[in-house]
């Protein structure tokens, strides 16, 4: 959980700060492809934010193609090679 340590500031939305931070971890390969992200409640408690904030972050990451969800199993980092290929044609 240490890699998810983030000092939130009051200048911008918490969910955007967390989204950008996790996205950067994924892009920088600090969270590997197919690695499971922390459960929503656990990450929310760790970051001292509401569960809904993390839900919003995970939904945005999924919409942007950085993660995928498996019902009953969790949220996982997507294959970034496929994301890069997809972006070529967008």
Language model segments and positions:
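N-terminal basic, amphipathic alpha-helical segments
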Residues: 1-90
């Amino acid at each position: 959980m240490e890699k998810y340590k983030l000092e939130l500031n009051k200048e911008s939305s918490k969910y955007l700060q967390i989204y950008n931070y996790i996205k950067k971890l994924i892009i920088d390969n600090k969270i590997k492809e197919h690695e499971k992200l922390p459960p929503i409640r656990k990450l929310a408690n760790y970051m001292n934010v509401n569960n809904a904030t993390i839900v919003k972050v995970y939904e945005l990451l999924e919409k942007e193609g950085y993660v995928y969800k498996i019902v009953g199993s969790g949220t996982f980092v997507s294959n970034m090679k496929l994301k890069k290929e997809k972006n070529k044609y967008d």
